[in-house]
Amino acid sequence: MNGGTFTTGKEKERAGIYFNFKTTAQERVSLSERGTVALPVASSWGEAKTFVSISSVEDLNKKVGLSIDDPSLLLLREAKKNAKTVLMYRLTEGVRASADIAEGVKATAVYGGTKGNDIIIRINQNVLDANSFDVTTYMDESEVDKQTVKKAEELTANGYVTFTGTGDLSSTIPLTGSEGDTAAETLNASAGIRLSGGTDKAPVNSDYTDFLAAAETESFDVIALPVAEGDQLKATFAAFIKRLRDGQGQKVQGVTANYAGDYEGIINVTEGVLLEDGTEVTPDKATAWVAGASAGATFNQSLTFVEYEGAVDVLHRLDHDTIVERLGKGEFLFTFDARDKSVSVEKDINSLVTFTAEKNKKFAKNKIVRVLDAVNNDLTRELKALIKSRKGSGSDIPASEDGLQYVKTMITQYMTTLQDAGGITGFDSDEDITISMNEDRDGFLIDLAVQPVDAAEKFYFNVEVN
C-alpha cells in the first residue's frame, strides 16, 4: 500500500494512506515581526560594552537608570521613534564620580560618566531610632534608594552607588559638590552630598569594532554606525554587513553616513534635519532615525514620503537637480515641503548603484530588499524550527520524496501567507517552486521564484482641459 504526504487539491494516482501535516505546519509558518535595531551610544551612564534591550521608557529607567530625555540619549530617542526595540550598546565608560559621605566612608558611582555627578547622598537621623540614620540616594533629585543603618559598614550597594569604608555617620565633614560648602558642616536633615569627578570617555574606532563583534551574536533587523568620520571604520562596517548577509545568511541592513557602499545592505545617509527644539541632527546622528525607521517598517511598507517625527526643517535644502543627482548616487535624503512645513524621506533607497543581470535596479529599493530578506530569514527560521521539532520527536526530515514534499508544502504555505499580506504577487507553487535531491542525496536543492510588490511612489495624471 502506498503512503506519504499530500497537498490539498492534488489527487494521488495511487491508492494509499496519506498524512497531511497542514494544521501543525500552519501554526508554525508565519511572517516574522520586524522592529529591532542595534545602536551604539556614547551615553553618560550605564554598563559599557554590553547590549541592553530597550522596548519602552520603563525598560530604560529599570535597566539603565536614565530618563529618555537625558541629553546623552539623543540617538536612542531618534531610533525609538519608529523601532519597537533598540539594542543599546554603551561604547565607553569614563571616570566614576565619588564623594566622602563620612569620615573614612566613600560613595562611588557604579558606572563611569558625567551622569554620576548628578547623584546626591542625603543622611538624616531616623525619626523612630535616634541611633540610626536614613541614607538616601538621589539621581536628578529623584529618590532611587533608601537604607536605614547604624554604622556605615551596614550600607549595601544599590543600582547607583557602592559604599566603602567604616565609620560613624554622624561625623562632621565637608559637603562636596553643593553650593555654599564650608570647610566643616554637620550632616542634618537637609544635607546633600553630591558626587563629583565623573567624566565621559570619547569612543574611538576600537570601541566601534568591539560593538560590531558583540552584535554578531545578537538578533536584529538593522544596525547603525553613527560616526561622522573614518572611512576605514565605515569600510569595516560594510564588510561586516556583507559577511552577515552573504556569508552567514543573516539578512540585515546597515546604516551609516556619507559612505558610498554600492551595496543593497548599506544605507547611505547624507542629509540631516533640524528638530523642533533646535537640535541639529547631522547625517551621522540621523542614521539612528533611519535605522529605527527601517527596522520598524514592515516588509510591505516603503519609507518614501514617511515624515520625520519632530523635525521642522532639513539642514540643507536641495534643489530639484541636486536631489536627482544625489539619488542617482544612492544617497538617502530628507526633503522639506514648504507647503505643509513637513520633513520626510525623499526616497527609500540603499547605496546600490551598480546594477547587473543578477541585481537590477529593483535591489536599490529598500522595500524590495525587505521582502527578499523576509523570505530568507523566515524560511530559515521555519526550517530550523521544523528540524528541531523532528529531532525532538526522535526523527529527521527524510531525504526522500516524502521529505521533499513536506518542505515544499511548508514553503508554499509561507509564500501564500506572504502573498496574502501583500508582500509578493503572482505566486504559483507549481511554477515557482522547484525542489530536487542533491547529488549526495542528503539534502534538497530548492529554486524559488519571487515577485515582490513595489510601493506606488510615482503618480502620473493626464489632465484634459475642456
UniProtKB/Swiss-Prot annotation:
Belongs to the myoviridae tail sheath protein family. It comes from Bacillus subtilis (strain 168). InterPro entries: Gp18_domIII_N, Phage_sheath-like_beta, Phage_sheath_subtilisin, Tail_sheath_C. It comes from the Bacteria. This is Phage-like element PBSX protein XkdK. Gene3D superfamilies: 2.60.40.4290, 3.30.1370.220, 3.30.1490.360, 3.30.360.90, 3.40.50.11790.
